[in-house]
């Protein structure tokens, strides 16, 4: 049975090639075609002999996701992609354009088991984990379609990265490899809802990668309501693991905080958050919620402008470095899960 060559790390591919009589430098050539020239057809890899191309075609194939939909913001060029995988499941990726860099936001699972109440992805349910190749292929597919060079990566798309730990770590190492994309570990961020034991493991396995924790509430009572996994991993456990992560890596931790009108945007919430993060040197991203349909009593509405500023002022007063995230792609379905959810709904 032929295998998708993108699912192999560099080291694994060297081993696979040696089994079929191909030298190590042939891996360099193939990776150069795939990762730098975005060529996914062995027959067009002209610095390989016809015999070698035939050998590769007999044992491997190159599968990158099929583009189903692409939305480009007229405001800031933010680009949202909807991809179809080999098994017809769908995932999303996003390109974010900055004056000095292009950042890719990529998915790690089809759907998400975390089921955060404010997230369109979580409301669609969980299907399966992505392979390392499916994670990495989002990067090269986006580069090919938008003709850009991606320099920063955030694992903040569909899915909980730390619940697909092995494949996520493998994909990071593949993207960092000097023969592949050669993206610095320090330009890669992994966002998690908070899996304490995996946060500590990540510190040991990928100490240079940046960590972002989706906290969203300063206490267990409120977090239980919007982040169901908090019933398993409490705020206190998450903060403790973040401190252990800092101790091991010496990296600053970013905390994501979704602001929801008249739920977690009060002065008292800001005071409790400041107390929780006291002495950590943490960074807080304040994110006004993207409205999503809700079947419960809680309405996911953006806070008033003055409430957002009031929350920020409290953190400033306590010397907690923070910023209000500037929205990108407001004229397209740029929030996580929106494009896929609409596609699934229209198919029914």
Swiss-Prot record:
Taxonomically, the superkingdom here is Bacteria
What this protein needs as a cofactor is: [4Fe-4S] cluster
How cofactor binds (record note)?
Binds 1 [4Fe-4S] cluster. The cluster is coordinated with 3 cysteines and an exchangeable S-adenosyl-L-methionine.
Concerning Pfam families, the annotation shows: Radical_SAM (PF04055), RlmN_N (PF21016)
Quote the subcellular location field of this record: Cytoplasm
Cysteines paired by S-S bonds: 105-336
- Enzyme Commission number(s): 2.1.1.192
Q: Listed GO cellular component terms?
A: cytoplasm
| Catalytic activity, as annotated | adenosine(2503) in 23S rRNA + 2 reduced [2Fe-2S]-[ferredoxin] + 2 S-adenosyl-L-methionine = 2-methyladenosine(2503) in 23S rRNA + 5'-deoxyadenosine + L-methionine + 2 oxidized [2Fe-2S]-[ferredoxin] + S-adenosyl-L-homocysteine; adenosine(37) in tRNA + 2 reduced [2Fe-2S]-[ferredoxin] + 2 S-adenosyl-L-methionine = 2-methyladenosine(37) in tRNA + 5'-deoxyadenosine + L-methionine + 2 oxidized [2Fe-2S]-[ferredoxin] + S-adenosyl-L-homocysteine
Q: What is this protein called?
A: Probable dual-specificity RNA methyltransferase RlmN
Native organism is Fervidobacterium nodosum (strain ATCC 35602 / DSM 5306 / Rt17-B1)
Q: Which gene name does the record give?
A: rlmN
């Amino acid at each position: 049975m032929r295998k998708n060559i993108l699912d192999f790390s560099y080291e694994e591919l060297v081993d696979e090639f040696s089994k079929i009589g191909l030298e190590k430098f042939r891996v360099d050539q193939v990776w150069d075609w795939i990762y730098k020239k975005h060529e996914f057809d062995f027959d067009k890899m002209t610095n390989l002999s016809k015999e070698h191309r035939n050998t590769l075609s007999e044992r491997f194939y190159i599968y990158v996701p099929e583009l189903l939909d692409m939305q480009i913001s007229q405001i800031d060029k933010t680009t949202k992609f909807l991809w179809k995988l080999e098994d017809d499941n769908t995932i999303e990726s996003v390109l974010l354009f900055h004056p000095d860099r292009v950042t890719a936001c990529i998915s790690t699972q089809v759907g998400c088991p975390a089921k955060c109440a404010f997230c369109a992805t979580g409301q669609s349910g969980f299907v399966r984990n992505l392979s390392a190749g499916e994670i990495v292929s989002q990067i090269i597919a986006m580069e090919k379609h938008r003709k850009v060079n991606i320099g920063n990566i955030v694992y903040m798309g569909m899915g909980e990265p730390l619940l697909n730990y092995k494949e996520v770590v493998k994909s990071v190492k593949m993207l960092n490899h000097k023969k592949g994309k050669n993206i610095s570990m320090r330009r890669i961020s992994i966002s998690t809802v908070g899996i304490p034991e995996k946060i500590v493991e990540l510190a040991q396995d990928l100490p240079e990668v940046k960590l972002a924790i989706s906290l969203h509430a300063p206490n267990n009572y409120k977090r239980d309501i919007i982040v169901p996994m908090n019933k398993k991993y409490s705020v206190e456990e998450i903060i403790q693991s973040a401190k252990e992560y800092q101790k091991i890596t010496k990296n600053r931790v970013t905390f994501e905080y979704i602001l929801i009108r008249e739920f977690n945007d009060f002065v008292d919430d800001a005071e409790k958050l400041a107390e929780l993060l006291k002495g950590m040197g943490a960074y807080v991203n304040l994110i006004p919620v993207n409205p999503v349909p809700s079947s419960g009593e809680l309405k996911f509405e953006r806070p008033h402008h003055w409430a957002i500023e009031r929350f920020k002022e409290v953190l400033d007063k306590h010397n907690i470095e923070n910023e209000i995230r500037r929205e990108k792609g407001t004229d397209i379905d740029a929030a996580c899960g929106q494009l896929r959810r609409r596609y699934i709904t229209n198919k029914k």
